[in-house]
Amino acid sequence: MVTVQDFFRKFIEFQNSPNEKSLQEIVKLVGQLDLRRFNWVRDVFEDIHVKERGSKTALIWRDINTGEEAKLSYHELSLMSNRVLSTLRKHGLKKGDVVYLMTKVHPMHWAVFLAVIKGGFVMVPSATNLTVAEMKYRFSDLKPSAIISDSLRASVMEEALGSLKVEKFLIDGKRETWNSLEDESSNAEPEDTRGEDVIINYFTSGTTGMPKRVIHTAVSYPVGSITTASIVGVRESDLHLNLSATGWAKFAWSSFFSPLLVGATVVGINYEGKLDTRRYLGEVENLGVTSFCAPPTAWRQFITLDLDQFRFERLRSVVSAGEPLNPEVIKIWKDKFNLTIRDFYGQTETTAMVGNFPFLKVKPGSMGKPHPLYDIRLLDDEGKEITKPYEVGHITVKLNPRPIGLFLGYSDEKKNMESFREGYYYTGDKAYFDEEGYFYFVGRGDDVIKTSDYRVGPFEVESALLEHPAVAEAAVVGVPDTVRWQLVKAYIVLKKGYMPSKELAEEIREKMKTLLSPYKVPRIIEFVDELPKTISGKIRRVELRKREEEKRKKGEVGQNEYVF
């Protein structure tokens, strides 16, 4: 057996000089860990980082809108989280109680994460743009014992509570009947949690249906995040910034566990409203960020800027996650800064599963290779394993042995039966691999377009569309057709300076004919102002398909829609 402390010290060493052989050794050590009694804050954050690098900066925070900023060492962040935990306990919270969290990017968000894990509570991070109705749905599915919010979102949570009586805490300002979080002692004993104890629940934003509640344990994210850290490549010496909303699982992956696993410095930048991309990249430059993670939506916006204004002298690592990043975006960033954006793949239900490791040659358009902690298999519709390159199949995870980063399950048993079948966890996504074992994302199972006898993955068509100079964003869906079953339709957001017209649509189609097989070229193009997205930046193609169904029922055509 290896102790938790020795394991993570070895992992920190590995991160400083990663290679494939050492990664395999790390994976073997995971199997030797005794995690029956495990509290990540006690065993890793405090026993390693606070003790051994307590004076090192753990968090640098800035608010773009207000100009506020803060810097906290590992020791200071530990004291802050202990005060939060003492306060929660004073108000009657105990192990297993449910704490909903809806806050902006703020130092207290990190402190609450630490306090909840240390205290053995069940945390439910929630997106800051959720409505009262959406919060009511969540509260009805999993009743809160306490809610924590900021002054901008408190009213939404309060109204959603209705007649529910719970403890309410505010991270900033004052509000009647709400409590402050830092009134108590900075001494707080850890709860003696077990590895199988539930500590985090997420309601997935989802591209289809109602949100699903995903249940994670005291080890699945806290220890499983070594996969994310090793793919992102974050090191002890890094200033690591992850552009993510606090309610997204990727915040837990990349703003919390991954950098704090290795003793790095986390950078948190808060902004309200629409992302000011120029200003945000200016902060990346001014703060001297060395490791930067952002969703594809942001990267696509970044490359529309005048990139000559930026000098990222310290930036060494850039990664993307959420949906596959289009090769054209990777090329533009590489040409300008000599930095390759490395793509990776994971879910709220897991940690990072497939990725372009720092030591791996990047193939633009590929999401990389599977992490050895996950036994990834592609299965056909009959459940048989696909062994030939370029055949599209369901992305699944072999359950024997069960990966440490995999969630416990859904709260919905029907969904569990659909997803856990015959020894595999079905992700709901489809992909193929090439002759070198690199994986390529095709789409959600229901996103794949069936036109005549062909199957078309939306990502490939969207990537081709982005190569046209007028296209800022694109989403591709299948729309009903009596002859071909479905037609390929492209929704396009134009860059500034371009106006919708049939001539431009024809020009884009002509460009597509040089890049795609004829059956993949969109037969319908509609120009729109924006695309519907989840809180994590994923395109909601299901919403676009619903729009198409409604339009066809009514016999309507879009204002800037062109059929060929």
Swiss-Prot record:
Chain positions recorded as substrate binding sites: 348, 455
InterPro entries per the UniProt record, alphabetical: AMP-bd_C (IPR025110), AMP-bd_C_sf (IPR045851), AMP-dep_synth/lig_dom (IPR000873), ANL_N_sf (IPR042099), Mitochondrial_ACSM (IPR051087)
Protein EC: 6.2.1.40, 6.2.1.1, 6.2.1.2, 6.2.1.17
Binding site for ATP: 204-212, 343-348, 429, 444, 538
Residues binding CoA, per UniProt: 452-454, 484, 513, 521-523
Annotated TM spans: 105-125
Cofactor(s), by name: Mg(2+); Mn(2+)
Record bears the keyword Cytoplasm: no
Coiled-coil region: none
GO cellular component annotations of the record: membrane
Compartment list: Membrane
Record's function text: Involved in the 3-hydroxypropionate/4-hydroxybutyrate cycle which incorporates carbon dioxide into cellular carbon. Catalyzes the ligation of coenzyme A (CoA) to 4-hydroxybutyrate (4HB). It can also use butyrate, valerate, propionate, acetate and 3-hydroxybutyrate (3HB) as substrates.
Protein name: 4-hydroxybutyrate--CoA ligase 1
Source organism (scientific name): Metallosphaera sedula (strain ATCC 51363 / DSM 5348 / JCM 9185 / NBRC 15509 / TH2)
